[in-house]
Amino acid sequence: EFRRVLFRSSTLADYGIGVEFEAGERALGDAFSAGLGSDAESRIATGWIMMLYAHELRIDWDSNWRCVAFARLPLETAENDSLTPGMYWDDMCDYFDGIEPDSVSGTVTVTQNTAFGSMAGSTSAGCEIRVSWTPLDGTGPDGTMDAGAQVRSWAAFIRSTIRFEEDDAS
């Protein structure tokens, strides 16, 4: 689900625009915003992607173009182990198409929340990915960077991390 358009910081590039979206089910209403331990939280993923353009070739990008993205992804508490960051990173990279292969860089953060007091016993886990990459120029229909393909790839990755109720039934 498309949520809103984002605009770039003038310190990053001359031009830029991005989109924010979410995937999943908000079946339990406000349980996601209430926080820890909700089933709804395990079925929501959010993220954004921004396409940046600099008039002058950026040496650190090796291009005029750069994509910057963020995702907050669901994670089953039992899946929170030392292998998780690498698995999420590898899965994410499988969704990229039309990019400079050596240009992908970023971080994966896995969180574990433990509640206390009146919320005692509630735990939840999550994963956050911050990543940037250089898209290939000339892949779009008009011979420029295909921004739509970059957005579709990022959205497909985020959606792939959601477990829907029908998945649980099988």
Where are these regions (language model features)?
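Short, small-residue-biased leader/transition segments that mark boundaries at the very start
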Residues: 1-6
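Short, conserved charged micro-motifs
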Residues: 28-31, 77-83, 138-150
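Mixed-charge, glycine-accented linear interaction segment located at domain edges/termini
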Residues: 130-170
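Short, internal acidic amphipathic alpha-helical interface segments
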Residues: 80-118
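A glycine-rich, hydrophobic loop/mini-helix early in the fold
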Residues: 20-71
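Glycine-rich, often proline-containing surface loops adjacent to acidic residues and nearby aromatics
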Residues: 16, 61-77, 123-134
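Aromatic/basic-lined ligand-recognition segments
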Residues: 47-55, 111-130
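A composition-biased, non-transmembrane "mature-region" signal
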Residues: 7-14
